[in-house]
Every structure is written in C-alpha cells, then in structure tokens.
Amino acid sequence: MFILIAIVSDIHGNLPALEVVIEDIKKHDVEKIISLGDVSGYYPFINEVIDILKENNAINIIGNHDRYIIDNNECPRSHSANICLNYQKSVITNENKEWLKTSISKYEIDNISMVHGGWVDNEDEYMMKIKDDYFEKLPFKYFFCGHTHVQKHIKMINNKEFINPGSVGQPRDGNKEAAYCLFDEKIGEVILKRVDYDIDKVALKMKEIGFG
C-alpha cells in the first residue's frame, strides 16, 4: 500500500494561498500533511493558517520565522518582515503560539529527511546550490527542505534526491502560483504542484490592517 504525503512550506500567513493548496491536496488520497516551516511572517493570517494546519493534523517543522514568533525575536535581514512579524506577535492566540512551540526541528523516517533550512543549520541555511558531496555522508535518499521559496527536484549522481516543494505563500521562482509537492513513499515518486489563487485577497487584507 502506498503512502502519499503532501509537503507544504513557507506559508507565511497567506491564507488564500493555503486554502487553495488544501483544496487541491484533498483531491488526492493523502495520508498526511507535513509543513516544512515558516508558517509565520510576511502576511497577516497567522491564526487562520495555523487553525487549518491543526484541522488537518499537519506536522510542522520549525522555520526561522516561526522561531522569531516563539522567541519574540526579530529577523536580522528584513525590516519589512519585522513589521508583519510584530503584527503577528500581537494577534496570535496563546493556543496557536503553543501549537507553534510543538514544531519539530526535523522529520526523519526510513530513507527520508526533512528540514526547513538545511542539514547544517536546520532553520536558517539556504540550500541554493545543490552539491552531491554535501549529502554524501548523510544516511538518507530523499532530502526535503524549504526556506528558499524556489521549487525544485534534483536527482543527484549518488542516487539521492533533493526536493524543495516551493512556497505556498510567497514563491520566488518567477511563478506566482502557490507551490507544494506530493510524495509517494512506496515508489519514491515526487510530484511538484502549482495552484493559482487570488492574490488580491491578500493585498486587500494587508491594506485593511495598515500595510501599504
């Protein structure tokens, strides 16, 4: 029996994008949903996206933006990111903050390893250039991470595979559609997915709460 996993990442508080992704996921016989982190940051719907993940029993791997919320820290690289992080810190419910605290640092089972950033720094390493020797001594075949917001699937010469499902909430690969992927554990099949959504809904909400 196959086990189909839906892998999402970098939702960043973008409710309209997550809603269409969940709708698309439900068209498939998915056993579980795993979030590679950064539920938080950039867009305002922090409680709504966490509620959806909870409703779908999703596992969340902690991302750097999630850490900023939990530890009440700021992003050292982006003033604009901190503006929305501060908003999210002010509105997130205690229940949802506690859920965020249950996020795991990585998910590893059989020949699969999943993190938010990379395998040196799970939370804040950018895996932009994929080199075979980086993974050579790591005892897994399938490596999943987010953080870069760039969807890709690379088959390496050492029979290992690198997969970034892309970003649900803020793609940075030239395609504005929300990104995620499906993974068939039994046969090792990776299916990269894109789903269109109404970006104007996000822009309107941002204006309503005073961002632009």
Model regions and ranges:
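Active-site-proximal segments of metal-dependent phosphoesterases and phosphodiesterases across multiple
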Residues: 3, 77-79, 112-137, 171
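Active-site-proximal beta-strand elements of phosphoester/diester hydrolases
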Residues: 4-12, 111-118, 162-166
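Hydrophobic "anchor" residues on beta-strands that sit immediately upstream
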Residues: 6, 34, 59, 112, ...
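Core catalytic region of metal-dependent phosphoesterases/phosphodiesterases
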Residues: 6-9, 13-97
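Active-site environment of divalent metal-dependent phosphoester hydrolases
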Residues: 12-17, 41-44, 65-70, 120-122, ...
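Short acidic-hydrophobic surface loop/beta-edge motif
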Residues: 105-110, 154-158
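Anionic-ligand binding region
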Residues: 117, 128-156, 160-165, 178
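Acidic, His/Gly-rich catalytic cores of divalent-metal-dependent hydrolytic chemistry
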Residues: 155-212
